[in-house]
Amino acid sequence: MTEFDLSTREGRWKHFGSVDPIEGTKPTTKNEMTDLQSTHKDFLFEIEEVGIKNLVYPVLVDQYQTAGTFSFSTSLTKDEKGINMSRIIESVEKHYDNGIELEFNTLYQVLCTLQTNMKQNAAGVDVSGKWFFDRYSPTTNIKAVGNADVTYGLAIDGDKVTRKELTIEATVTTLCPCSKEISEYSAHNQRGVVTVKTYINKDQDIVDDYKNKILDAMEANASSILYPILKRPDEKRVTERAYENPRFVEDLIRLIAADLVEFDWLEGFDIECRNEESIHQHDAFAKLKYRK
């Protein structure tokens, strides 16, 4: 058995099984290597979407930098074997500047670059990240940072936008109307997780504060908003407001829908509320879909 010098890194590597590289016969320069993806012949079917998922990149949501998780795709004609996936990252890098701004205009520019680099007609992106924003306590007006989850979806075909979506997930307080009605005092309440997926008009300019308008519809219709910081006067106000505004999951999604239906820049929406029930071992939920 060969003995290696364990005082060196190379010796330890070989001791654990590493071997020296062999003298190969295949090309080592890019121009000489076979490019299988670029093979052209009849591959039977065109592909609607092919690309990469779970690409994590820095993004900017308003004034805060956070991590975005991306899914990028392009179309592929039936006479092409595959796409060059490294060009997807190259397309992203062309628009990177201490983070990619999570706005539809920026994502549209990224997709246009992707179209050009991939030489395909269609391209799409979905990206999720944390949205951080200033939140003030209701009575003492102390500022802290709140958050919600956002997911942008955008797709283009040629110069036409074919899909434009925004999903927001936020947490609220819901107080049970039945518990309040039947009890001499108090009522059980819990944290509710509200998810709103909006389908945005592709041919109309969107309002500047669209995220805040959607979030307001989600939170204002709940029994209470959640706050990062609450002093005693704030906690009193939050508790009393929840008692004044009891909500079933059914109530909440209907009230949110009543606000969203008034936004002329929306073509439709899906709403789900899931209550993490404080007196049960199960959750309660309700879903609603609406198209104009």
Curated annotation (Swiss-Prot):
<comment type="pathway">
    <text>Cofactor biosynthesis; 7,8-dihydroneopterin triphosphate biosynthesis; 7,8-dihydroneopterin triphosphate from GTP: step 1/1.</text>
</comment>
<comment type="function">
    <text>Converts GTP to 7,8-dihydroneopterin triphosphate.</text>
</comment>
<dbReference type="GO" id="GO:0003934">
    <property type="term" value="F:GTP cyclohydrolase I activity"/>
</dbReference>
<comment type="similarity">
    <text>Belongs to the GTP cyclohydrolase IV family.</text>
</comment>
<protein>
    <recommendedName>
        <fullName>GTP cyclohydrolase FolE2</fullName>
        <ecNumber>3.5.4.16</ecNumber>
    </recommendedName>
</protein>
<dbReference type="GO" id="GO:0046654">
    <property type="term" value="P:tetrahydrofolate biosynthetic process"/>
</dbReference>
<dbReference type="InterPro" id="IPR022838">
    <property type="entry name" value="GTP_cyclohydrolase_FolE2"/>
</dbReference>
<dbReference type="Pfam" id="PF02649">
    <property type="entry name" value="GCHY-1"/>
</dbReference>
<dbReference type="InterPro" id="IPR003801">
    <property type="entry name" value="GTP_cyclohydrolase_FolE2/MptA"/>
</dbReference>
<feature type="site" description="May be catalytically important">
    <location>
        <position position="176"/>
    </location>
</feature>
<keyword id="KW-0378">Hydrolase</keyword>
